[in-house]
Each structure stands twice: as structure tokens, then as C-alpha cells.
Amino acid sequence: MKKNVIKGTSICVLLFLVTATNLMAQHICGTVTDMQNQPIGFANIVLLSARDSSFIQGSISQEDGSFEIIAPSPNTYIIKVSSIGYQTTYQKTQNSKKEHIVLSNDSFILEGVVITAKRPDYQIKDGNLVTRIENSLLSKSGTGNDVLKHIPGIQEKEGKFTVFGKGTPIIYINGREIRDLSELDRLSSTEIRQVEVVTNPGARYKADAKAVIRIKTVRQSGDGIGIDIRSTWGQSENSRLNEQLNLNYRHNSLDIFGTFQYIHNEYLLTRRVTQDIFVDTLWQQKNIMKEASLYNNYKGELGMNYQINNNQSVGIRYSLYASPKDKVWYKAESEILANGDYYDHLLSSSNSVTVKKPSQQINAYYSATFGQLTIDFNADALWSKVRTTNEIEETSHKQASRMIQSTNKVDNKLYAGKLLFSYPIAEGTFSFGSEYTHTHRYDLFANPQEILPTTDNHIKETHTGFFAEYNRFIRIAYLNIGLRYEHISSEHSYSNFFPNISLATQIGKFQTQLSYTTKIKRPFYNQLSSNMRYMNRFTYMSGNPDLKPETIHDLTLSGSYKWLQFMISYQREKDAILYITEQYKKNPAITTVTHRNFNRIDNFSAFLTASPAVGSWHPQLTVGVQKQWAKIEHNGETLQMDTPLFFCTLNNGIQLPYHWTLSTDINFQSKGDYQNIYMYQNVFMMNATLTKSFLNEHLSIHLQGIDLTHGRKDGNRIYNKHMNMDVANVSDSRELRFTIRYKFNTAKSKYKGKGAATEEIKRL
């Protein structure tokens, strides 16, 4: 604690020293627009001396075209503004007057066709990789999910996204945190303007935010009713449906929006599990399991946004989610050996039904600017109830057969708020604020046969955070420095400081950033639960109430040059949370699958992406490596778990005549080590998509082939002190998918709510 206080005090002093300089500087601000008065974002702003045209300072316009640049002293200067696709403009500053700079299109006429220069697809902005989607081939890809799959450094597996070398990101759409990844599926790719990947989030984000993805949509204008209808049918070994209706009404300053979605999914999974237990008796289990699942999900959303004036807006969003009856069935056959000799043979069948009662969530926000002071306030509330009943019938060849029944009741309540202030100080911007989250979780598990213990978990957790960060341009570099303090109060209390610092610069067309941050990974609530789940009479699953949070120190170098992007990262994880197997205390022949903290794991990761454009062909090649250093005690030996994982992705997009687009994606992942798991299966996948648009882009059809090679198969070997477990999974991942979408007068919501508790909601 003393070290944390010293560290925090040092950073606060540094913040004070930085903000206390150059108080006599001149703030020059304004907007950049085109000839139709539409804002131009990401234009290069250069401040030049009026005396000799020497370089003084540089900046970039924001998405809304606004910019602010700091001059060392009050004087007359020249502003040079350039953006690819527009003619470069020079303009003298008008003292304290707000500048309005208009750029003309940089185009030429060839045989009656106007050809306009295309903006680059990739750019480093404030040290973050920004990918522009609007009017690019990616805008034809389908949904927000399809877009993210093609962003450098982002990986997708079974509908979930990770940032390479970082982990699961927080995702924003127009500044609002999303809690349900199906929102990405509901978002059309044509509505996305850009995607920004933040690999080292600053102090304004919670300490467990290891990466952030910010999606900004295309600015829409005009009043009236907008309609967006989509229908998707998928066929693997089962059928899948996704039906969606979006409505939007906009009039003057009022914006009302609503969404309804129905999803029907069926899945098949075959799993082979082999367990070796090294105790006084060498126990071995060989299991073959076949699982089928059925889900029907209903999602509704209603919200409004009201623009009070040019500087203030307020809004509220209500979301409802229900899944009346999720069903999972499986049948398993298990052979048990003791010291290599036959011991027993088990046949098991399971029927599990989960009822997710309507989960309700409310988000409200207020956003305002008073002079140079910016205020953002967000509040969240969530209520959910889940009821699960499970019945397992187990037949033993040598012992008495069993019927195991269990019920699990989970109630969640969450209340959260976040307040953020920003104000320009000493050639930069100083931001500070606070965050509060209160969570109440009730988790009751019961087994009438008393084979498993009845547990009654009540978790009340209060999370309080305070943060401050400062960013500014220093000569040719962009500096961001911040400090966050968090206090967690529950059965175990934790107080921590989390510093971060980054420095970004540009040399010609080469842009780069070096950053350091400290993050934390808190256990999910089901990992902390003391509930036990029955698999068979030799295998249980359980949580671990004694799990501690995992601390991560991260040093990252990233950069971009023309159509090349790269990232190199080193991480040290303390108290890493590992998925382990161990012996049940009451009977060492029984395996318990749970989680434990591990002392330390060091990780190195790097990737390189090349995204050239060759005529109508737009390839994107990404190669990466991820290597760890970890030692695991196993059966009296020390295993060095340091085999690297290699990744390779090749995305190909081709623009065809008559509004046809073809894309193919090839993904490869090699064998290698992750934590205490050896992944012994190479994974090779191929996807293809054919898209056609009609009626001036109002109607579109998409034909997709998912995992055409049926290569999404995984094999994992888990090592522990007295046990190892092999798990091999094969699912019905090969799928043919057809989507038809119609949009009329669509306009994205102006909703600016950012959410106040996304990571806490994920833990629930």
C-alpha cells in the first residue's frame, strides 16, 4: 500500500508540473467543413509562423470537424489544413475569433465521370489505430461483427472478440458502452464510419478494461421515420434464424428509436475427455459426450434523445431481454480404469432447462459543454433473474445407478454512475471524474439427493473509483498521462492505484506510440461461487470463493506506415487466474474442475498487418505470435510452458461490377501453450461472402459460407500438479447463411449514453 501511495503521489506531482506550464499560451480553435458545410474529421491541422512559415504545432480535427491547437504566445499565425480528397488550404488566424475553414474537393473529370481521391483506410490518432469503414469495401461486409473481423489486431471466435495480446475489449458505439454483443450483429456495416482500437486504455476507463474498441457511425441528417428490416437464415446440421426490426423517428431536436430482435439457435457438439489422476491409485477416465442445445432469445429496446441546445443533450434507453426456455441435452459414455485395470463403465444422460426471466436495463445520460468545460454523466440500473433445473440419470455397470437433480436460482441487481469533466489547461486537456457501482448477487444451489452440498451465496460488492488524466502535444509528440484509484468493498476489500502513460509521434508517414499501463482482471461471479456441478460420479465442477484479482503490467509499442500496421507488447501477470483440475478432498478419485491463482506468467505478443490495394482487389495479411513463460508442477516434474502460438489471417476483398462484392477469409492458428494448457490442434478455417445491393443501396443480399473447411476444432491438454486432462471438441460450425436487408430513410440514433458499468455487468 505504501508503494502504491508513493507511486500515486509521484504521478500527481508530475501532472501538476505539466499543467502548470505555459499558462500564457493562445488557444486557437475552430471547425473544418466541406463546401456543403459537412464536417471533415481527421484533417491534418498545422500551425505555421506568419513571419517565416516555420512549423510550430500540429493537431488533427475531431470527427465533428472541430479542432483546437495551442500557440506558444498570443500572435498572428497561419493555419495549414489538409486532408486526402481535398485541396490544401492556408488561412491566417483571426485573433480570438473561432476559425471556420472550408476545404474544396480534390477531384478531376475523366470522360464525364468524376473521380475523387480516396482517403486512407488506416491512421494513428492519439496513439490509437483508426480504420475508416465508410465508402470502403468493408462497408459492404454485412454487420458490425463482419467489420470487426477484418480490423488489424482483432480476433474473433464463436462470436466473441479479443484484441491481440490484450484480451476481451470494452466496445463502444457512438460513445455508448454495449453490454450485449448482439448489438454488433444488429448494426449494419454501411452505418459504420470508423473503428478505433485502443490497446492501452487510460485512467478514465476501469482498471479491468484491457482494451477498448470505439465504433462511430455515419452522420445522418433529415427528419422523419426510418426503417431497417433484416432476416437471416442459417443452415448447418440445424437451422438458425435471426429476425430484426429497427425503427427511428427524428424531428428537430427529438430522436426516438426502437429495436426488436428474435434469435433461434440450435447447436451440436461432440466432446472427448480423457483424465489421468496421479495419486495412490492411477485413475483414468475416458469420456465421449454428445451435446445438443436450443435457444430462443427475444430482445427489445426503446429510447429517446433530446438535444436541448447546441451544447446540451439528454437521453434514456430501456432494454429488455428474455429467453423463456433454453435447453441443453447431452449423453455421455465413460470408462473408468484403476492402475490400468477395468473399474467401471458409466452411461449418463442429462436434461438442463434454463429460464431467463425478462432482464431489464436502463441507461440515462446527460452531456453538456459550458464554455471550454465538458461534462458527461451516465447512470445504469440492471435487474435479472435466472432459474436452472438439471436432471442427470446415471447408470453404472458395477455400482448403484443414480438420479441427480439440482436447482439453481440467481438474482442480480446493479446500480452504477459515472461523471467525467474535461477542461483545456496549459496547451492540453485535463480530464477527471469518479465512478460508482453497487452489485448485489443472490445465488442458491440445491441438490435434493445431497450428493452435492447445498450452497447459499450472497455477494454484495461496492466499487468506487476516482481518476485523472492529462494529454497534450509536446513539439512533435502527443503525451497522455493518467492515474486511477479504485476501492472494492465486499468480503475482501482491495485498494489500488493504476498509472498509465503513453507517447505518440509522427515522422513523415510513420506513426508510432509507446505506452505503459497497469490493469486488473477480477474473477467472474460464477468463478467465485461455491456451487458444485455434477458431471458424473468421478467429476465435479466448482467455483472458488478465495480467488484474488489478477494484476497486469503492460508495455506496448504500436505503429503504422502507409498500409502497414504493427504492435509489440509485453505483459506480466501476477496472481493469474488459471482453469485447473484437482482432487476432491473427500475422495481423491473424484476430479474437481475449478480455478486457482498462479504466481506469475510473462507474455510476449506481436503482429504485423499489410493492407495494400491492388486495383479492385483489397487483400489484408496479418501474421502474429504469442509466447508465454510459465512453469507448472506436474506429477513430480516442472513443465516449461513456453511453446509459442502463431497466427495468420488472409482476408481478400474484390469489388465486382454491377454492385457485387466477393470476400474470402482464411485463418490459421498453430499449436502452442496458453497458461497451463497445451493447445495440440492446429486450426484452419475459411469463410466466403458474396454481396449484392439493389435500389440505390436500400436493398442488399448476403450469401455466406462459414467454416467451409470445417476446421474449427480444438484440442486442449490441461496440466496440474497431480492430474492432466485432454479435451477435444468438434462442433457444427460449418454453416451456409443467407441474409436479406432493407433500409428506408434510416438514421442512426444520436444517443450519447456511454454506460457506467459494462465490465461489472459482464462479471454478472
What residues fall within each predicted segment?
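Short acidic/polar hinge/loop motifs at secondary-structure boundaries
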Residues: 150, 176-202
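Short, acidic, small-residue-rich periplasmic hinge/interaction motif at the N-terminus
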Residues: 46-48, 82-86, 98-137, 157-158, ...
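Short, acidic Ser/Thr/Gly-rich low-complexity loop/linker segments typical of extracellular
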Residues: 51-66
